[in-house]
Structures are given as C-alpha cells and as structure tokens.
Amino acid sequence: MVFYLVGLGLGDVTDITVKGLNIIRRCKKVYFENYTSLLSFGFDQTQIEKFYERPIIEADREFVEQKIEKVLEESLNEDIALLIVGDPFGATTHSDLLIRAKQIGVSVKVIHNASILTAVGCTGLQLYNFGSTVSIPFWTDNWEPDSFFEKIIINLNNGMHTLCLLDIKIKEQSLENILKKRNEYEKPCFLTCSQAAKQIIKIIERNKGNLVVNADIFVVGIARIGWDDQKIVYATLRQLAFEVDMGIVHW
C-alpha cells in the first residue's frame, strides 16, 4: 500500500495533474493539508469534493502535528493521499512526513506540481540568480524576529535575489486560548507585501549606518501567483510599504 503526497499547484482544483487526480480517485482515504497554503477559493470542502469526486478529510496544523502518525500507520494497509497546495516539498513539514513514513516502512510516492519557488520566474527574474529563500513572520507587540534579514543581506552582497515567503495563519489559537485550553481559533490572516516591507524598513532603521541598503532599494512584490487576478509590482521598498495596494492575498 502507498502513502501519496499529491501536489495541487497554485490556482484552483483544476490545476492538479491527471496522474494526481487518478490517484485521488482510487485512494481509500484523502486528506487535504490546509495550513501551509491555500487554493484561490480557500478551503471549500464542497467544491473540492465535487471536482475530485471523493470525500475529503481536512488536515489542519493540529492534525498534521498530532495525528498524522495514525494516518501513516493506516498507509501500511491501504492507499492514502495527502493533498498539498503547490508542490509537496515546498514546505519542510512535508519532507518530515516522508522521512517518518519511511522509518515505519510505509511506501511513499510523490506527485509534483507547480510551486511558488519556480513560479516566481513570472517576474522576469532568472531563477539561477536567486539565493537562499527566507520566510518573513508576523510581528507582534512584543516579538519582532529579524533573523531572516541577514540572509537577505548575504544574498544582496552576492548579487543574488531573495524570495521572501510571507507568513499565513490558518486555524491557529491565541496564546490565551492555548493557556486556558479553549478549543477556539483565530480568523485566518495573511501577511501582506506592504506589512512585510514595513517590517524590513524598521529593521533597516534599527541598523542605520551599518547597512548598504535603504528603503529606496527596488523590489518586486507579487501576490496570488497562479490565480486569475495575480499581481506583480516593481517599486521601491518604501513605495511597496506605503503606496502600493497589492489587494487581498486570499478571500
């Protein structure tokens, strides 16, 4: 029996490969991982099940982190698919799943698809000229991590571009709800290009005089790549932060 990691691409349900669709329709169970990314319409279980012609089980962060072992064990006796937006290896979480499955003797097959890691080529920037990819997290009132910025500077000094992946929060709990053990979740939220640019400018201001970069450096902002209304903007970091409206990232 096989545990399938099936990439769905970047747009909607129709972006799946023919191979991936055939696998979904013959698997005993099908799970949809919905916390590392989302399709253009969010997680609409009815729409997904109608197109794939299969019952779909939602796999949120809590499920993948705490209950996936049972799914892997079931894969020893039946074919199971985990659907992943983009390409299965676009997030380290899924690489870990592959390793864990192999450790208990589960056969794993991967069905690849489009990923933002390659689709960023739509900006006109050459993929060969990208350095390390970074993730920019949401800042809070008392937590402003900036370790990602060091990689941006290293790439810049080496004449390389940096792909910055912006944070998303899907079905997550507040610290208060976690401490009080309340099964309540925050509304989905997505870090925008504007917010990320403002955070970077704040980091630059903290290190004023020690950097060769400033808020007038040119950057490319991209949103909803692979969707019908994708947007690409070339502007200064300052313009992206305060003047450019990239629109909503998701619904």
List each language-model region with its residue ranges:
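Structural motif
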Residues: V2-Y4, K28-K29, P55, D79-L82, ...
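A contiguous loop/helix-start segment that scaffolds small-molecule binding in enzyme catalytic cores
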Residues: D79, L156-W251
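Conserved beta-strand termini and adjacent loop/short-helix elements that scaffold enzyme active sites
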Residues: A59-R61, I111, I222-R224
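Short, surface-exposed amphipathic charged segments that create phosphate/polyanion-binding patches used
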Residues: E69-N77, C122-L127, E144-K151, I178-R182, ...
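Class I SAM-dependent methyltransferase SAM-binding "motif I" and its flanking Rossmann-like core
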Residues: G86-T162
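Class I S-adenosyl-L-methionine
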Residues: M1-S107
